[in-house]
A protein has these predicted regions:
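Conserved RecA-like P-loop NTPase ATPase core
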Residues: 20, 83, 111, 147
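N-terminal beta1-alpha1 ligand-phosphate binding loop
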Residues: 16-41
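Structured adenosyl-cofactor binding patch, chiefly the S-adenosyl-L-methionine
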Residues: 120-165
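A structural boundary signal for the start of the first folded domain, especially the loop/turn
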Residues: 11, 26, 38-55
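S-adenosyl-L-methionine/SAH cofactor-binding core of RNA-modifying enzymes
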Residues: 45-46, 51-107, 113-115
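Short, aromatic/basic amphipathic alpha-helical patches
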Residues: 32-41, 97, 119-125
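Conserved nucleotide-binding/hydrolysis micro-motifs of P-loop NTPases
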Residues: 26-27, 114-116
């Protein structure tokens, strides 16, 4: 099955795009590693960092940030596969991720520090998938780095490059 997948993805890979939407103040501890993977995926990766909304009312922050995400997803990514990274999501192996991406442009959402109204997101985008890196809590920069490394790993699987063992 892997050979069939490689053949199928390799021919489509030159057109495949990934976008990562992240609500976060800073990834300063991960800048170097993020830059390295951005360089490796430069034709295929767009990262958009959205500034978190500052307010003591966390429910209001969640509501506003979710509204902003929905607007951006409709405006820029209406026809893309959408994946929300959230602890209640489903975990996948790298090989499963490479199959799920299925040669379709994909946007990933890393929500803000207080969470996201996933019910509102799923109402706006019923086909949105929910993925998880497990039940642990990660800093946004590390979650973004982990995601981008996995995307790079998938591309090496599709192109036959030696990276994933």
């Amino acid at each position: 099955m892997t050979c069939i997948l490689l053949d199928r993805f390799y021919s489509h890979f030159k057109f495949l795009m990934f976008s990562v939407l992240s609500i976060s103040d800073s990834d300063k501890h991960f800048t170097s590693a993020l830059a390295e993977y951005q360089k490796r995926l430069w034709k295929h990766l767009k990262i958009e960092d959205l500034k978190p909304i500052k307010d003591d009312n966390h429910q209001l922050v969640i509501q506003k940030e979710t509204k902003n995400l929905i607007e951006m997803l409709w405006k820029k990514y209406a026809n893309w596969q959408k994946i929300l990274l959230i602890k209640e999501g489903k975990s996948f192996s790298t090989l499963e991720i490479s199959e799920v991406l299925n040669a379709k442009d994909t946007v990933f959402v890393i929500w803000g520090p207080y969470g996201v109204d996933d019910k509102a997101l799923l109402e706006a985008f019923p086909d949105m998938k929910k993925w998880s890196f497990g039940a642990i809590t990660l800093p946004h920069g590390l979650a973004k780095l982990t995601l981008i490394e996995q995307l790079y790993r998938c591309t090496t699987l599709w192109t036959g490059k030696k990276y994933h063992y």
